[in-house]
């Protein structure tokens, strides 16, 4: 009897997960075609909004930022002027990162790989539509 139950358990689990996905899709369709425009969202973090994109959902955070120009030039002119004032700086350190210092490039890439793995935390939002229906979305 127990083996019969174990054989049906994966099928039951798949069926239930499919029903949950269908109900979530039905609730999202209930918000209407202008889902991204007519939407209030209540999230644990401030100023989170959902917008629709051709590729799917996009979670945006905060207000749009202004593009601020920095003192660095595209050609690396600022790096050249600062390294000229340091007399005992080796020529390898004066080169831009793209040309020299392959060991430093490896350190930076490995640090990005390590930090990228542990950054993902589950994030949930309750999305409230204009008609009062709500959907809980988790990443």
UniProtKB/Swiss-Prot annotation:
Molecular function terms from GO: hormone activity; insulin-like growth factor receptor binding; signaling receptor binding
Tissue specificity statement from the Swiss-Prot or TrEMBL entry: Expressed in placenta, uterus and in fetal perichondrium. Expression levels were increased in both early placentas and molar pregnancies and were reduced in choriocarcinoma cells.
Disulfide pairings: 31-125, 43-138, 124-129
Residue span(s) of the pro-peptide: 59-114
Keywords noted in UniProt: Cleavage on pair of basic residues, Disulfide bond, Hormone, Secreted, Signal
Location in the cell: Secreted
Entry GO CC: extracellular space
Main location: secreted
One biological process term in Gene Ontology: cell-cell signaling
Signal peptide: 1-25
Protein function: May play an important role in trophoblast development and in the regulation of bone formation.
Recorded family membership: Belongs to the insulin family.
Protein name: Early placenta insulin-like peptide
Origin species: Homo sapiens (Human)
